[in-house]
Amino acid sequence: MTTTGDHGQEEDAPLRRAPQLAVLVEGGDRKGLLHDMTAAILRHGGDILSVEIVERGARSAVYWELDGVEEPESLERAFLEIDVVTRLRRLPSMFQVYGKRIIVVGAGAQVGQVALGAIGEADRHNIRGEKISIDTIPIVGEVALANAVRAVGRLPRAVALVLAGSLMGGEVTEAVDELRERGILVVSLNMAGSVPEHADLVVTDPIQAGVMTVMAVATTALFDISRVSGRRF
C-alpha cells in the first residue's frame, strides 16, 4: 500500500472514496424540484457528497452521491413519491468508475509526454483493481495557469496535479501553495521559474513524471512520496 505522508489521507476524504449511495433521479422538471429532493435526503439523514444536473428542461435528470443515508430503500421511495419523478436508478459511483483523478496542466508538448507516462503506469495498476484516470489540458499564460491550478481543488476526486511546462512562477506559484494546503499532491517538471521550488516533487523527464505521479497515488504501488519530497530527479 502506498504511504504518502499528508497525501496518504486521501482514502478518508469524502470526495476521494466511493459514497454509500449513487442514484440518478429522472422525470419532469419544475421549480422547487431540487428543494424537494434535498428535503427527502435530509429526512433520511443523508449527507450530499456530490450532485450534478445531468439534464434539464422538459425533462430532468439529477445525479446524487450520498453518505449516511439511514434507509436507502426508503429514500428511493421518497424520491419516487415526488410528483414529477418517474424513474430512479442506482449506479456505480464516479469513484468506482473513474477513481482518483490526476490532472496534467501546461504546454501541449510536455502535457502529452506526461500523459503518456501516466496512462501507461495507470494501466498497470487499474488491471489490478485500482482506478486512476488522467485529465489533461494544454494551457499557457500566468493567469490562465493559476486559475487552472486553483480549480483542481474544486474537482471531485482530484488527488494530484502535474505542472508541465518550461517556465512557471508568480501567481502560479501562489496557486500551487494553496493547492498543497488542501492536501493535493503537486508534481512539477524541472523548469525555469519558482514553481519547482514549491512542488512536492520535481522530475526532469516528463514521461517519468507521469509514471511517478501515478505511483504516488496508487494503493497498489509501494512508493513513499514523503521520502523523496522536495528532491529533483
Which residues are covered by each model-predicted region?
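A conserved regulatory-domain signal marking ACT and ACT-like small-molecule sensing domains
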Residues: 1-107, 111, 121, 136-140
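Conserved mixed alpha/beta catalytic, RNA-binding, or beta-rich assembly cores of soluble enzyme
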Residues: 88-233
